[in-house]
Amino acid sequence: MKKTDVKKLAAAAMLVAAAVVGSMFSIPVGASKCSPVQHLVNIIGGVYLGPWYSLGMAFSASLIRNLLGLGSPLAFPGSMCGAFLSGFMYHTVGKKLCSMSFARSRNLGSAVRLPLAYAGELFGTSVIGGMLSYPVAAFIMGKEAALFTYVFPFFVSSLGGTLAAVVIVTAMKRIKFFDTVLGSETVENK
């Protein structure tokens, strides 16, 4: 295992721990327990570690939260969809947009990519995760709900975490926090 892999795994583990501890501050909405800190961690992981690490972090945090009684099974579809889409939008879509001559000539970089990560988290968690929560609620939890029941509560929770991420990720980029912690091997610099 390479040294950078160990550093990335350690960073992911710290972010999972932050999500679990942060879930003690949750907003109960129906059968779900919305945790804005999870969405903040999803964006940080998606931006600095990539979509696959972020997806694994969201799964791990959701599993631990459920085992400790701090979350519900609805944590899985919401957090995992938002985490993956945040990283995917930042790294794949954002990189393609930044490689276009229009964006290159204006040196847009993070000005384009970060809003894509935020939008990915919001859309992935609220719309996709909210709709995927329907079968989880109906078949696993025994709660009858309409298909779009969880979209708005998930959006509100995700919006809180995303607004916090706007402030925190911008500050982390300014001081090059993860470049210092992980070295130059962050997904960002590849």
Give the role of each language-model region.
Residues M1-K190:
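Loop-helix junctions at membrane interfaces
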